[in-house]
Amino acid sequence: PGNEKEIEDRFYRELEFGTGGLRGWIGAGTNRMNIYTVRKATQGLANYIISQGGKEKGVAIAYDSRRMSPEFADEAALCLAANGIKAYVFDALRPTPELSFALRKLGCISGIVITASHNPPEYNGYKAYWEDGAQITPPHDTGIMDEVKKVTDYSTFKTMSLEDARAAGLYETIGAVIDDAYIAELKKLVVHQDAIDAVGKDLKIVYTPLHGTGNIPVRRVLKELGFKNVYVVPEQELPDGDFPTVSYPNPEAEEAFALGLALGRKVDADLILATEPYGPLPSVPH
């Protein structure tokens, strides 16, 4: 009976594509995140892009540190490629705001981020973005949702091999060039560089990426702005989709700061900073 209930839960419905895209447990079944549900969502997105005349513009794809994120990113890319839509895929995990930047920089019609934000490690998800760099909004959200709903036969989802997609010029790896352009733009947002110059060599900052995407870009920005004393929480420094040091990888939760606060006391920090595993939301404990 227990097994039957689990099978029913996995298959009793389709994982719904809403305004936030897909989000669900990773596993087999139509009500789970897996390569087939990712292909279904992407086939619907591809159909919508083609209907909007955006086929030639391409789609940028990023992913976070969660289980299966790189694999799901490639599944989405290869489905797009099989539909004649070029995919620009990051060479490793990146924070979500960089995806928004990349798709505008590259002139893409759409973007995809494989992430489940700060959900528990059993989850993954799929977020769709439009050419303005924001998550899908009317009328595109309902347009894409309708196209995804129309895709009912799992045997009709298009895909192709990575080798064929590359050979056809429909799969391009992106990375350092976008990173450099993105960070250059971020640095332009600084209002008082003179204030950083005055205190940067003395201010002590503790930072934790919470096993997510922020480690490299956040440290790079802080260093290039002139902050000399940045201490990264070692237990949470490297990407890990199991989030072994926290039960809930959300910087708004006090528990997420436990190791950061401990390191902060040890080094007498002036500031403790955390970012969500997928990168966009920094948080500072009061």
Each predicted region: which residue ranges?
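An N-terminal, well-structured beta->alpha segment
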Residues: 1-76, 165-201, 213
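Gly/Ser/Thr-enriched, mixed-charge loops and adjacent short helices
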Residues: 6-15, 124-256
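Long, contiguous hydrophobic alpha-helical segments, chiefly transmembrane helices and signal peptides
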Residues: 15-26, 37-38, 45, 94, ...
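Short, glycine-/Ser/Thr-/acidic-enriched flexible segments
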Residues: 22-24, 29-31, 66, 94-95, ...
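N-terminal small/polar loop signature for handling phosphorylated ligands or for N-terminal nucleophile
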Residues: 60, 65-123, 226-281
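A short acidic (Asp/Glu
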Residues: 70-73, 215-218, 283-285
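Active-site phosphate-binding/coordination module
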Residues: 98-157, 274-277, 286
